[in-house]
Curated annotation (Swiss-Prot):
<dbReference type="GO" id="GO:0009507">
    <property type="term" value="C:chloroplast"/>
</dbReference>
<dbReference type="GO" id="GO:0015979">
    <property type="term" value="P:photosynthesis"/>
</dbReference>
<comment type="function">
    <text>Catalyzes the formation of the isocyclic ring in chlorophyll biosynthesis. Mediates the cyclase reaction, which results in the formation of divinylprotochlorophyllide (Pchlide) characteristic of all chlorophylls from magnesium-protoporphyrin IX 13-monomethyl ester (MgPMME).</text>
</comment>
<dbReference type="InterPro" id="IPR012347">
    <property type="entry name" value="Ferritin-like"/>
</dbReference>
<comment type="pathway">
    <text>Porphyrin-containing compound metabolism; chlorophyll biosynthesis (light-independent).</text>
</comment>
<keyword id="KW-0150">Chloroplast</keyword>
<dbReference type="InterPro" id="IPR009078">
    <property type="entry name" value="Ferritin-like_SF"/>
</dbReference>
<keyword id="KW-0934">Plastid</keyword>
<protein>
    <recommendedName>
        <fullName>Magnesium-protoporphyrin IX monomethyl ester [oxidative] cyclase</fullName>
        <ecNumber>1.14.13.81</ecNumber>
    </recommendedName>
</protein>
<dbReference type="InterPro" id="IPR008434">
    <property type="entry name" value="AcsF"/>
</dbReference>
<keyword id="KW-0560">Oxidoreductase</keyword>
<dbReference type="Pfam" id="PF02915">
    <property type="entry name" value="Rubrerythrin"/>
</dbReference>
<keyword id="KW-0479">Metal-binding</keyword>
<keyword id="KW-0602">Photosynthesis</keyword>
<keyword id="KW-0521">NADP</keyword>
<keyword id="KW-0408">Iron</keyword>
<dbReference type="GO" id="GO:0005506">
    <property type="term" value="F:iron ion binding"/>
</dbReference>
Amino acid sequence: MQTTINNGQTSSKETLLTPRFYTTDFEEMANMDISGNQEDFLAILEEFRADYNSEHFIRDEEFNQSWSNLEHKTKSLFIEFLERSCTAEFSGFLLYKELSRKLKDRNPVIAECFLLMSRDEARHAGFLNKAIGDFNLSLDLGFLTKSRKYTFFSPKFIFYATYLSEKIGYWRYITIYRHLEQHPEHRIYPIFRFFENWCQDENRHGDFFAALLKSQPHFLNDWKAKMWCRFFLLSVFATMYLNDFQRIDFYNAIGLDSRQYDMQVIRKTNESAARVFPVALDVDNPKFFKYLDTCACDNRALIDIDNNNSPLFIKSIVKIPLYFSLFANLLKIYLIKPIDSKTVWNTVR
């Protein structure tokens, strides 16, 4: 018997760290002039049309077994991983599908790119939801569509955030895949075998958003762009780091040290971003991860306070110094002198 999960049944609260659903200014995006980067868009569109993974997401006989042998805590953490991943992929599907619909008459090349990316995201979400089904659960994607709150971002911010989301997704998947390729004894479920090809979808999507950013030079070439790029780099890195700090046991179950894994992913994503953004974060500064560790501990303490039985008023008072410490350390990271990446735009590949 399968249980359908909807938002009201999940234990995770809506927080800054949960996967989000976005909308944007469709009119502004329709009016964008992409002619300065037209060749790149046409090349990317041909890549999307090729649909290299059309036959990849097909379940094989390894899925046809009972997973009751998984230790209870590991199973719970893995199901949460699947749910969060499915929600994030489905969020991308909804955004890209809506963009393709709104832009098809005004910017057909960009519209078709979004349509084909929505195909990929839907495929990923469906594959993840089938995996959830192996544990007699199913994520109610229709309920998610109707019930989730949508966050408005201007196109510029959508480009920054989604470029980084796709690139960090690539590095997360490929890092896990390469680790489990070397240590198959830690592959607790067959979905990890699919990550090598899967992550190439993420990489291609990231390349599309890189082309969008480069087609709008004012998104990259002034002091405000530098400030926003630093902000989004820090936001994406800190969100992943704080989330994964709560899920150390899951990474242990697949043979990974979550901190070392996150450090590797952050470094690689930062290198990728340096090919597009005018600045990169100085992740090799010893203070960078020191401050992130403090943020992760503060966030963990805030969660522990939420989970105890103290009166709400007492909880609120106890949280104040933790919030102050958390945001103060994030500000310290933001103020670490960034690296000017313009010098490597034409040399780093």
